[in-house]
Amino acid sequence: MTQKTIRVGDIEIANDRPMALFGGMNVLESRDLALRVCEEYVRVTGKLGIPYVFKASFDKANRSSITSFRGPGLEEGMRIFEEVKKAFGVPVLTDVHEPWQAAPVAEVCDILQLPAFLSRQTDLVVAMAKTSAVINIKKAQFLAPQEMQHILRKCEEAGNDQLILCERGTSFGYNNLVVDMLGFGIMKQFEYPVFFDVTHALQMPGGRADSAGGRRAQVTDLAKAGISQGLAGLFLEAHPDPDNAKCDGPCALRLDKLEPFLAQLAQLDALVKKFPPIETA
């Protein structure tokens, strides 16, 4: 099965290439914190030889509570992203929530992310696709993996085949998500790169009444399970003080654990991709 390669700057992303990392923080809490977090990611990924893209949100439009922190907004967010790119020379990924945001965000960011909750919104999908930017498509918690082909077709019909799929867990009753490992193989059949968002797969949506809970202690186990499927890469959020993060702290890896965490995953990824495929159908 041929696997497509997506290029982001100098980075080549594909299911049969060494894993890449979309990593950063959940939301831009401040300029200084964004620079601090990105600096550590750049140091660790450079040491380990992992292709790296910085990620963060400028606006968390789907928070549980109307009083929850959302971020600096588009204008200030783009200024921070521009500074991150200038300081560290890395590509940047961020999510957009409304069609009008797609074009201005694409002027700054290298990858636009289609949020899971909004992944069937055709007007948003088409607006993002028409920017010609690479699009990271989050699989909605309520969609089966095979249904992702319809979102891919929408993007292709709008003229964009620079696409990445991203698993982030499936609703399992109330306030819980699970990851179906068989889903990775189904999505890889579409030939586009597949990533695993281990951070949000650890969520317990609404688990803290007015915000999401999480299971940070299981991040290594779940990440290893995902990477064992031979994926294009991992989507990860880390924070120097997760217990006081302004969004999704219960799911975030502690920043000081980033190097040992990624070192193990890079070794596992290399091992898995050494194995020749076995036809069992």
UniProtKB/Swiss-Prot annotation:
<dbReference type="InterPro" id="IPR013785">
    <property type="entry name" value="Aldolase_TIM"/>
</dbReference>
<dbReference type="GO" id="GO:0005737">
    <property type="term" value="C:cytoplasm"/>
</dbReference>
<keyword id="KW-0808">Transferase</keyword>
<dbReference type="InterPro" id="IPR006269">
    <property type="entry name" value="KDO8P_synthase"/>
</dbReference>
<keyword id="KW-0963">Cytoplasm</keyword>
<keyword id="KW-0448">Lipopolysaccharide biosynthesis</keyword>
<comment type="pathway">
    <text>Carbohydrate biosynthesis; 3-deoxy-D-manno-octulosonate biosynthesis; 3-deoxy-D-manno-octulosonate from D-ribulose 5-phosphate: step 2/3.</text>
</comment>
<protein>
    <recommendedName>
        <fullName>2-dehydro-3-deoxyphosphooctonate aldolase</fullName>
        <ecNumber>2.5.1.55</ecNumber>
    </recommendedName>
</protein>
<dbReference type="InterPro" id="IPR006218">
    <property type="entry name" value="DAHP1/KDSA"/>
</dbReference>
<dbReference type="Pfam" id="PF00793">
    <property type="entry name" value="DAHP_synth_1"/>
</dbReference>
<dbReference type="GO" id="GO:0008676">
    <property type="term" value="F:3-deoxy-8-phosphooctulonate synthase activity"/>
</dbReference>
<dbReference type="GO" id="GO:0019294">
    <property type="term" value="P:keto-3-deoxy-D-manno-octulosonic acid biosynthetic process"/>
</dbReference>
<comment type="pathway">
    <text>Bacterial outer membrane biogenesis; lipopolysaccharide biosynthesis.</text>
</comment>
<comment type="similarity">
    <text>Belongs to the KdsA family.</text>
</comment>
